[in-house]
């Protein structure tokens, strides 16, 4: 009877959340079509998923659960390889609606080559990502893919590296430009180089000249509904994850970042005010060894930094300019030994008379080895509504929730 009541109660909460989402009125008619109008709805639904996973754990269904709602949604399934597309229902935060190639067929990459970026060979990753149809892209075997030019992705694609060891390395890397519904999961991306001044195909019917690319691991440009999850990213020429030019509805989760200078840029420039539509969730990531700054570095928009583990930085962890709203909740910050680098935050190119009005708050964060967060602006929760995307858990649980960050060593027939 108690279990029945719990299920009925959870169902009622879900119906209520959906009713709120359907009937929420648009508060700003000029607001970007992909931005979240009711972040409280997002937080309520994610909070429900956390409670549900906890209840299942209590009932014995998920003895391997960690409290990380993304992982608890799929990782305990021994038959995950037979239900790969279930992953698309597990996203949270602002990028929660990214379905990738869920509604399409599977495409198996069999060839690691990239001989011709204009006429890619069937079976290559480039041939897969440029197709117009939705595709869930998987890999036949372990492989290292060295791209000659940017891998320009078409909409409704999932790159799923689970079950094999896939590296995109030592060449060009991923470009997500003017597209929607992309999932990148379970791959290693490292040692990316600047490339360009070349012709590159972006769809079956189009190719064109590309100027020089910066050498980002993952570049998100003018795109929406993007989910970057469980990847290992390091040592690229520019950024590891950069999102610019009105990109929004993005979740960056469960990634392992190492050995890099400028880790994550969110916002094109101080003068590009169209990035005010940007909403990004940064959750359950491990910012690890050899990192220097920009975890992330934000401009203009709304950024929810929640339940991440910051174990290394040399300059600062979270920075920004041009008045972004930053909502830091339940993170663990371990400051470096350097006594002049203990501060988590950095305001770029702006005096205190201006940045004191920016809404930057720290709530429930854990500060170790002298780390500290300089708050500014309003403290009230209402001012952070557009920078709220999920319910933070206690910072004491961060170590457990991020312990499997990065590309996972998944094997068929075993819990991932």
From Swiss-Prot:
Cofactor: Ca(2+)
UniProt-annotated binding residues for Ca(2+): 214, 238, 242
EC number: 4.2.2.2
Catalytic site: 294
Enzyme class: lyase
Molecular functions (GO terms): metal ion binding; pectate lyase activity
UniProt cross-references to InterPro entries, sorted A to Z: AmbAllergen (IPR018082), Pec_lyase (IPR002022), Pectin_lyas_fold (IPR012334), Pectin_lyase_fold/virulence (IPR011050), PEL (IPR045032)
Pathway given in the UniProt record: Glycan metabolism; pectin degradation; 2-dehydro-3-deoxy-D-gluconate from pectin: step 2/5
Residues modified by glycosylation: 23, 28, 52
Annotated SMART domains: Amb_all
Signal peptide span: 1-24
Catalytic activity: Eliminative cleavage of (1->4)-alpha-D-galacturonan to give oligosaccharides with 4-deoxy-alpha-D-galact-4-enuronosyl groups at their non-reducing ends
Keywords: Calcium, Glycoprotein, Lyase, Metal-binding, Signal
Chain segments annotated as transmembrane: none
Cofactor binding note: Binds 1 Ca(2+) ion. Required for its activity.
SUPFAM superfamilies: Pectin lyase-like
Biological processes, Gene Ontology terms: pectin catabolic process
Family membership: Belongs to the polysaccharide lyase 1 family.
PANTHER family: PECTATE LYASE 18-RELATED, PECTATE LYASE 8-RELATED
Designated name of the protein: Probable pectate lyase 8
């Amino acid at each position: 009877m108690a279990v029945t009541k719990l299920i009925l109660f959870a169902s009622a909460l879900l119906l209520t959340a959906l009713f709120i989402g359907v009937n929420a009125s648009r508060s700003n008619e000029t607001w970007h079509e992909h931005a979240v109008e009711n972040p409280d709805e997002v937080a309520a639904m994610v909070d429900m998923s956390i409670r549900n996973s906890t209840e299942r754990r209590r009932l014995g269904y998920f003895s391997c659960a960690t409290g990380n709602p993304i992982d608890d949604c799929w990782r305990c399934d021994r038959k995950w390889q037979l239900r790969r597309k279930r992953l698309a229902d597990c996203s949270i935060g602002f990028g929660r609606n990214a379905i990738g190639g869920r509604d399409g067929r599977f495409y198996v990459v069999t060839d690691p080559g990239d001989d011709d970026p204009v006429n890619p060979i069937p079976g290559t990753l480039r041939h897969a990502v440029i197709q117009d149809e939705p595709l869930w892209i998987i890999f036949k075997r372990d492989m290292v893919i060295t791209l000659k030019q940017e891998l320009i992705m078409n909409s409704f694609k999932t790159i799923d590296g689970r079950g094999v060891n896939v590296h995109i390395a030592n060449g060009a890397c991923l470009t997500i430009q003017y597209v929607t519904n992309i999932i990148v999961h379970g791959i290693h991306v490292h040692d990316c180089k600047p490339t360009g001044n070349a012709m590159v195909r972006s769809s079956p019917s189009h190719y064109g000249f590309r100027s020089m690319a910066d050498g980002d691991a993952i570049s998100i440009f003018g795109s929406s509904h993007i989910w970057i999850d469980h990847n290992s990213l390091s040592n690229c020429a520019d950024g590891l994850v950069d999102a610019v030019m009105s990109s929004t509805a993005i979740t960056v989760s469960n990634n392992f970042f190492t050995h890099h200078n400028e880790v994550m840029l969110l916002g094109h420039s101080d003068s590009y005010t169209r990035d005010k539509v940007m909403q990004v969730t940064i959750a359950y990531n491990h910012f690890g060894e050899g990192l220097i700054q920009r975890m992330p570095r934000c401009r203009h928009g709304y950024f929810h930094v929640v339940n991440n583990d910051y174990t290394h930085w040399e300059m600062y962890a979270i920075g920004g300019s041009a008045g972004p709203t930053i909502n830091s909740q339940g993170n663990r910050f371990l400051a470096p030994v350097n006594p002049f680098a203990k501060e988590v935050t950095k305001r770029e190119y702006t005096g205190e008379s201006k940045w004191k009005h920016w809404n930057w708050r720290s709530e429930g964060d854990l500060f170790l080895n002298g780390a500290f967060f300089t708050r500014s602006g309003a403290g009230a929760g209402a001012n952070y509504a557009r920078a709220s995307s999920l319910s933070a858990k206690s910072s004491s649980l961060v170590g457990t929730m991020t312990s499997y960050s990065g590309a996972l060593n998944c094997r068929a027939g075993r819990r991932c």
